[in-house]
């Protein structure tokens, strides 16, 4: 659900920021292209078959004792089945993942710009370039670009705080 996603992204943001900081610092002003997250959605989900086995085991042990755990696993199984894709390499990934879950793109853009700002404040030139992967239509790019620009404005302010980005 969205609350769980946002909590996970809040944990991921500082790790991403730290990684980007190290890259920007090492590159000393050379443009750095960062491709936003684009793994297939199924890579983030538990395996359907494993969930089914876990549910069966919980039910055979003691269904009444494990009622809450069974309900939780069954809810997760339903979500996994809803998100199943015939060909995950072409489906819900790249910009389409960011369109469905804009908070993912926003978190990563914030991490990029926060890291860039930290490096710039140390007097080291920085030039982040944000790449939106697997764009199939101009509207997909426009939607993702708007999220990235919003994050840049939030982090860098109106003047860009001396960080030039693409």
Annotate each language-model stretch with its function.
Residues 1-166:
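Conserved alpha/beta-domain cores
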């Amino acid at each position: 659900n969205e609350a769980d996603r946002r909590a996970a992204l809040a944990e991921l943001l500082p790790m991403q920021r730290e990684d980007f900081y190290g890259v920007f610092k090492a590159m000393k002003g050379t443009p750095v292209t960062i491709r936003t997250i684009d793994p297939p959605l199924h890579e983030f989900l538990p395996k359907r078959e494993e969930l089914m086995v876990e549910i069966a085991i919980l039910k055979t042990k003691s269904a009444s004792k494990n009622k809450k755990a069974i309900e939780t696993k069954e809810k997760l199984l339903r979500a996994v089945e809803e998100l199943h894709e015939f060909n995950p390499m072409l489906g819900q990934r790249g910009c389409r993942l960011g369109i469905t879950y804009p908070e993912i793109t926003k978190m990563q853009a914030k991490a990029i710009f926060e890291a860039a700002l930290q490096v710039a404040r140390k007097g080291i030139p920085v030039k982040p370039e944000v790449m939106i992967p697997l764009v199939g239509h101009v509207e997909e790019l426009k939607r993702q670009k708007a999220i990235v620009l919003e994050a840049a404005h939030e982090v860098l302010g109106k003047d860009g705080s001396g960080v030039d980005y693409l």
